[in-house]
Amino acid sequence: MSFLIRIGICILSCIIITSCDNNAKPDEQIDSTSKKYVLNEFGQITSTEFSTEAFEPSQNCQECHPNHYQEWSESMHAYTMQDPIFFSGWAQAQHDYPETGERFCVQCHNPVAFLTGEDLSDFSTKEELLGSDLPAQIKDGISCDVCHSTTSLSRTVHADDNIAAVADYHLYPGEGIKFGSIQDPEANEYHESDYNPIFNRSELCLPCHDLTIRGVEAEITFTEWNRIPGLAMSGALSCQDCHMKQKDDGTHDHHFTGVDVDLSYPFGESPLYNEIEILLKSAVDIKFEYYNVTLPDSISKGETLIIPVLVSSLTAHSIPSGTSFSREAWLEVVIRNDQGNIIYQSGVIGNNTESLDLTDVDLLLFTTQLMGENGESVNSITNAYSIINNSLPAFSDRYHQYNYDVVNDDNFLTINVRMLFRSFKPHMLNEHPDLLSNLPVFEMESICDTIYLKL
C-alpha cells in the first residue's frame, strides 16, 4: 500500500471517528496546576518549588500496583540511571561542556534531580550512584511519579550552542494526587486519583522524546509523528497505542517497549527481548515489486536478473528513530544457486558485532549520521552541528533495485531478503566490549522466492 493511500485512510478514519460524536470536544487539560522552577543560562536551578520528598519512590507503588511496578522495573525508564552507555556519554558531555553537560543529560534521564537541583556530577558509574546515600527517588531515574504527577503538556527541548538544559515540565507532586488515563478511577485511601485526557496524547512523551540542538533535529520521535497530517490533526495512533498497549482489563502495559535492549543481560535474556522482537516484526513490510516491475518466474543465462524490493513502513515515526544515529536497519540480500552456494550477497554480516560494509554499493541502509562543526562524523549529540538523515520516514515507501548477471548453468536461483535491525552500531560500543557481545540483531521482515533458468 502506497504512502498516499495509507495517509488517506488515516485521515478518513480520523474524520469518521470525530464525526461519530457530534458532542465531542477537544481534549483539554483538566488540571493545569503545576509547581514552578527557574533555570539560569547554564540550565541550573536558581529557584524551585519541587523537593525530592514530594516525589514518591516507585517502590511505594508496588503494593497496590504490583504488575505495573514489575513492568516499569524492567523498562528502559527504570534503566536511565543504570545504563553504562549513558554514563559514558554523560561523562563526555561533562568533559566537553563543564558548565552545562551534567544538567543537559540529567534533564531527561533524571527529571527529579533536574527539578530539585540535585547535582549528580560526582557519580561516574551506576554502581557509585546506586551505592550512594541518595534517595530512591533519584535512583529511580524516570519514576512512576514523574509521569503520574503530570498535569499539562510540555514542549520540545530546543538546546542552544552551550547545550544548557531547558526542559519544560508541568508536574504537581507531593499533594496526594495521581493523574492518569482512567476516566472513573476507583477511590482508595492512599491518594486521590484524577483523570486527565493528556495521558492519551503523544505530547505526554515530551519533553524527553523530542530534542533539537543548534537547530539540528537530533532526536525527534514526536516531531516525526506530528508531521503526519492525519495523526497530527486528530491525535490518532498515539505513542501510547503502540508503546503502552491496552490490556484486556483496560489498564496499559508499562514496559514502554521500544527498540532498546538492556545489554547487561546475556544475549537474548533481556526482559524485553521478546516484546521488542514482536514490535519490530510489525514495523515494516517488504515485497518483490515496485509499480510495474516484478520479479520474473524464469530467466535465461546471459540475462540480467532485476530484483525489485519495496520497503513499506508501517510505523508512525521514522525507522530508526530516537537516537537514530546509533541505530541501523538494513536489507540483507542473498542469492543462492541450486547447490545452496551463495553467488551474490549484500548487507551480510558475519556476526552481530561485525560492522556493515559501507563500501557495498548495493547496501540499503536506514540510519542517520551526526556531523561536527568542521563536517567530521561525531557520535555525540552534544557535538552535532548537522545531520545526514537516511532513515525511513513514517508510513513511507522505499524502492531499491538489485541487479545480478546470470552467468552459470544453474537450474534455479533462490533469493532471500531480510530487513534487519540493531539498536547500536558496533563502534558505538567500543568502550563497552562486555556489552557488545550481548548485542542482538533483530529480523524485522523476510521474503523469499525462486527463479528458474530457462533451458
Segments predicted by a language model, with ranges:
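Long, well-ordered hydrophobic secondary-structure segments characteristic of membrane-embedded
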Residues: 63, 82-121
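Extracellular Ig-like/FN3 beta-sandwich strand-entry sites
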Residues: 304, 410-414
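Primarily the internal scaffold of c-type cytochrome electron-transfer domains
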Residues: 26-52, 71-97, 122-385, 390-394, ...
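C-terminal motif of bacterial Sec signal peptides marking the signal peptidase cleavage site
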Residues: 18-19
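Sec-dependent signal peptide recognition
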Residues: 2-10
